[in-house]
Structure formats: structure tokens, C-alpha cells
Amino acid sequence: EAQDSSDLYAVGWGHHLHPIFATFHDDILIISKEEKGVSSTAGHKLMDDNPYSETRYMTVQGRMKQMLAALKAGDIELFGDILEKEAYSLHGLMMLSNPPYLLLRPGTVSVIEKVHEFRRTNKIPLYFTLDAGPNVHLLYPDLHKEVVQAFIKNELLRYCSEGSYIPDKVGNGPKQL
């Protein structure tokens, strides 16, 4: 557990990060601009009765410890593995809710498949995660920016709504207001 953590406000943790993570990009592929069929608030309520929620909570605790260790050690492969498993897990729970729902779109799945193929072929640490909707976040170190952004433009934008994506990167952390 991170010291001085809070469920109420953001707590800076950047001083614990391995320097490689300070250079990370988080480019967001906008697969759909449509309103989600199930809001995040409604999705959280559906978790209350999800038969797999307790298992999920236990799994998340273990993965959080692994993630913190990966972030401290600069273990990009472990970071990416956990990141992607969490994305799959979240959307799997949505499909197992009562009633079940699916926020992924065909473009989401196509992008995921392309990212797996790109990583396997190029040996570049490009990983994805998913927000609570169809959009895909691509995370990678700045060292690979040119190659990854060319891949986005040449291979992935066709799956984005109106070719929309938001190039972004790690910021300076939370600031007290």
C-alpha cells in the first residue's frame, strides 16, 4: 500500500517511479464518440451484485502490489502485463453483470489485435488499457515515440471515430488547489 494514500484525493507518487515511466506516453484512441449504453455510475452499481466482484477485489489487491513493484523497478514488461490483464478483467466483469453489457466495439478489438501483433513483431513495449468504454489507451516510453506514432497513424486511426486520437504523456502529478 502506498503511504499517505487516500480514496478522497490524488497523492503524488512520482518520486517513487523508475525514471523510464516518467517518459511514458498515454495516447488515447477515440473508437467511439457516442454516449455509453451504461454510465460509469450504473456500472459501479451493477458490481454490487456481480458474482465475481469479491474475486476481482482480491485480485486487484495483489495486482496493485505487483504494479507498484514494477513501477519502482522499471519493469516495463510486468507493468504492461498487469495493465492489459486489468483492462480485460474490467470488461469481462461488465459482460458478467446482471444484466450483462458490452461497451467494447469492433474497432476496440481490432486495435487490441494490432497492438499485440505490433509488439510481437517489433519487440517494442507498446501496451494498451481500456477506459470504461470502447476507447483504447496506448502506453509506451518516449524512446519509441516516432515508431509508435507512425504505427498509430498508418494502422490504427482507421478504427477511430473520424480518425480521432489524443496524444498525451505523463504529467507532473497532482497539485493542491
Where would I find each of the regions flagged by the language model?
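C-terminal nucleotide
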Residues: 16-177
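Gly/Ser-rich oxyanion-binding loop with an adjacent helix/lid
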Residues: 1-23
